[in-house]
């Protein structure tokens, strides 16, 4: 090869490096644009409290409403969403039926850029499956797993919703077939664990107390949020998210 001239292979190599540089620069520009324009991403993790679109006829879940309210369905919440305050997007990762052991899978291939916050609801299915009559280390094991997951998340703050009570505190509405006294004790233990963890990474959202003020129209299939319930979950998270 003569001095001062590039071979075809050398030219292709340099072109490839230039292309890679352009891609890297593009990613950097996108990240800076997201920060400069104030784009915020809301991440949802957890169970059907956040992944409840299949339980209402409009396919609505709380994360959608927090990012952009449906003004036709819920005119009272017009202007009360992240999109009204700037650029916002949703990354919905919560999965109906999830327990605490399923949370790490929801964060697989997670890539966080720019401003971001996370909301989590978990514990209800853990109670239904194992913890409602637990008299051993079950709640402590749940707490350790939840703390490990939240600690591993690359975004802050993280807002954790506690577990609501579809019986509205009325033992005559017991649908579990378990001594209500023991069930309520363990429900309280799970919520106490969630509260303790939430303080470390953001704050707790008290779904339990909020839903005690509601009525059966907030639920469907006994324990799932209805369309109204999805909006009420949104209502509970809204002050923290905004």
Feature names for model-found ranges:
Residues 1-18:
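N-terminal secretory signal peptides and thylakoid transit peptides that target proteins
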Residues 28-94, 112-114:
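Serine-esterase "nucleophile elbow" of acetyl-processing enzymes
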Residues 33-41, 102-115, 145-154:
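Short amphipathic alpha-helices and their capping/turn segments at secondary-structure boundaries
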Residues 43-44, 90-94, 117-121, 159-162, ...:
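Structural recognition of the beta-strand scaffold that forms the well-ordered cores
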Residues 80-86, 148-158, 190-205:
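A structural motif corresponding to the C-terminal end of an alpha-helix
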Residues 100-141, 165:
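Oxyanion-hole/transition-state-stabilizing segment in secreted/luminal serine hydrolases
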Residues 168-206:
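Substrate-gating cap/lid alpha-helix
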Residues 186-192, 200-203, 218-242:
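Histidine-centered active-site loop/cap adjacent to the catalytic His
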């Amino acid at each position: 090869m003569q001095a001062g001239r590039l071979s075809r292979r050398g030219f292709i190599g340099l072109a490839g490096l230039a292309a890679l540089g352009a891609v890297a620069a593009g990613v950097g520009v996108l990240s800076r644009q997201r920060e400069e324009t104030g784009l915020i991403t809301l991440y949802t993790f957890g169970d059907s409290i956040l992944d409840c679109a299949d339980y209402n006829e409009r396919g609505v879940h709380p994360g959608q409403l927090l990012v952009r309210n449906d003004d036709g369905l819920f005119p009272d919440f017009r202007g009360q969403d992240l999109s009204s305050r700037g650029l916002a997007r949703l990354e919905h990762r919560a999965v109906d039926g999830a327990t605490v052991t399923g949370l790490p899978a929801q964060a697989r291939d997670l890539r966080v850029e720019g401003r971001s916050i996370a909301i989590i609801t978990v514990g209800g299915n853990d109670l239904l499956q194992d913890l409602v009559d637990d008299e051993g280390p079950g709640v402590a094991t749940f707490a350790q797993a939840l703390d490990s997951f939240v600690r591993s998340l690359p975004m802050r703050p993280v807002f954790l919703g506690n577990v609501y009570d579809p019986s509205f505190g009325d033992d005559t509405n017991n649908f579990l077939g378990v001594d209500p006294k023991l069930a309520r004790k363990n429900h309280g233990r799970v919520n106490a664990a969630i509260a303790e963890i939430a303080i470390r990474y953001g704050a707790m959202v008290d779904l339990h107390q909020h839903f005690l003020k509601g009525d059966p129209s907030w639920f469907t299939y006994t324990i799932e949020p209805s369309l109204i319930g999805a909006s009420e979950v949104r209502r509970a998270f809204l002050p923290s998210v905004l």
